[in-house]
Amino acid sequence: MATGTPAHEFRELDNAELENRLKDAKEELFNLRFQKATGQLTNNRRIGTVKRDIARIYTVLRERELGLSVAPGAEA
């Protein structure tokens, strides 16, 4: 079963690690879409899971930008 990463796990990461995770997730989504187009995708649910993970990462980054949450190790 394709399960995503909970938001609280993303909140424990610093901004640099979140950016790396975002880049990796976007690459994975690209590859999954390519597999779907060529008929090689075996788990269709994974596309939605990766898209939700990307949205969660963007949400955590935006919360930090607005000052609603603080990155770990950073003092307010």
From Swiss-Prot:
Single biological process term from Gene Ontology: translation
Any single Gene Ontology cellular-component annotation: cytosolic large ribosomal subunit
Pfam families: Ribosomal_L29
GO terms assigned for molecular function: structural constituent of ribosome
Disulphide linkage map: none
The keyword Ribonucleoprotein belongs to this UniProt entry's keyword annotation: yes
Presence of the UniProt keyword Ribonucleoprotein in the record: yes
Transmembrane segments: none
Keywords, ordered alphabetically: Ribonucleoprotein, Ribosomal protein
Gene3D superfamilies, per database record: 1.10.287.310
Family listed: Belongs to the universal ribosomal protein uL29 family.
NCBIfam families: L29
Name under which the protein is recorded: Large ribosomal subunit protein uL29
Lineage start: Bacteria, Bacillati, Actinomycetota, Actinomycetes, Mycobacteriales
Gene behind the chain: rpmC
